[in-house]
Amino acid sequence: MASATVTKTNIGVYTNPKHDLWIADSSPTAEDINAGKGLKAGEVTIEVRSTGICGSDVHFWHAGCIGPMIVTGDHVLGHESAGQVLAVAPDVTHLKVGDRVAVEPNVICNACEPCLTGRYNGCVNVAFLSTPPVDGLLRRYVNHPAVWCHKIGDMSYEDGAMLEPLSVTLAAIERSGLRLGDPLLITGAGPIGLISLLSARAAGACPIVITDIDEGRLAFAKSLVPEVRTYKVEIGKSAEECADGIINALNDGQGSGPDALRPKLALECTGVESSVNSAIWSVKFGGKVFVIGVGKNEMTIPFMRLSTQEIDLQYQYRYCNTWPRAIRLIQNGVIDLSKLVTHRYSLENALQAFETASNPKTGAIKVQIMSSEEDVKAATAGQKY
């Protein structure tokens, strides 16, 4: 087994059913890595250099569950990661020590019907990192199947950690059937909404209108894509009233009458019932509302609006077969996600990172946790590390 010597203690970021958040020792230990213990066939050991905090990480911490996925014990968070290969099992031939990789955070069975038909995101036996009871990637070192470690070449680890949320939006673009010139609504200007904006712009959608309740996030969207049109959602307005404002914004302030252009597609990135309903009332006859955001178990939606307007309501679950494309898009400059990382912290300061990510007043878009203060300083200075 090929391996590098490690000297730092492996620590991880944990939560539990009591909603505590703390840093503690994790596995594999530095001693095990140096002794070549614990690495299974087909696996590599990775030093995790950057990990983004996802809204689901904050939700597992604060709420203890997402639907049926429940935190039942001490649980390591994090699933948006990139790092460097430290050790390689003898049967792994396509990776070597020192390779820079992004970690696709799933382990599938390769035996069920979804796996055998190429839709492995539906694997009935999947172990998805950071989804209870499977520990996540917010650790200094982690063992992971080599087949789910994608080479990123000279891409920064910061960009490598953005490949996971980019994969979410690429799955949405593909499944939704977005085409060149399609008028588009994006509801929610959080990280997924903003990455959807960049992805949809690259895919040729126009015009695009994006909504949010936060004026600052809409301004951020405008700084990313100056031609995007924005609509600030006012709390208390009905879905129909919001739809009128959205259509007016899509038409550059020229009104929302019967002849106004309506979105052919809405990418719903909030999972909030009122936002889903606003999207349903906004799209054209024969349009589609594609739900990316994760919401509550049950919602009330305007069924007859969907029925009489032949509006399709469609969803996605994670992603599959998207990572190679995501890597190419970033490497070739088609999509630039670098501006979305607004805050960076070392692993030792991960608790502060979570406080920043969970507080709307900080203005954070994407918070990343890096393996060392040196990495934080390099990334903040715009240096590739």
Swiss-Prot record:
Temperature dependence comment: Optimum temperature is 40-50 degrees Celsius.
Enzyme superclass (EC): oxidoreductase
Q: Which UniProt keywords apply?
A: Arabinose catabolism, Carbohydrate metabolism, Metal-binding, NAD, Nucleotide-binding, Oxidoreductase, Zinc
Which SMART domains would you find in this protein's record? PKS_ER
SUPFAM superfamilies according to UniProt: GroES-like, NAD(P)-binding Rossmann-fold domains
Task: Provide the binding site for NAD(+).
Answer: 191-192, 212, 217, 292, 316-318
> One MF term from GO for this chain?
L-iditol 2-dehydrogenase (NAD+) activity
Kindly name one Pfam family recorded for this protein: ADH_N
InterPro entries from the xrefs?
Answer: ADH-like_C (IPR013149), ADH-like_N (IPR013154), ADH_Zn_CS (IPR002328), GroES-like_sf (IPR011032), NAD(P)-bd_dom_sf (IPR036291), PKS_ER (IPR020843), SDH-like (IPR045306)
The catalytic activity of this protein is classed by the Enzyme Commission as 1.1.1.12
Q: Which family does it belong to?
A: Belongs to the zinc-containing alcohol dehydrogenase family.
- Name of this protein: L-arabinitol 4-dehydrogenase
Source organism (scientific name): Penicillium rubens (strain ATCC 28089 / DSM 1075 / NRRL 1951 / Wisconsin 54-1255)
Q: Which gene encodes it?
A: lad1
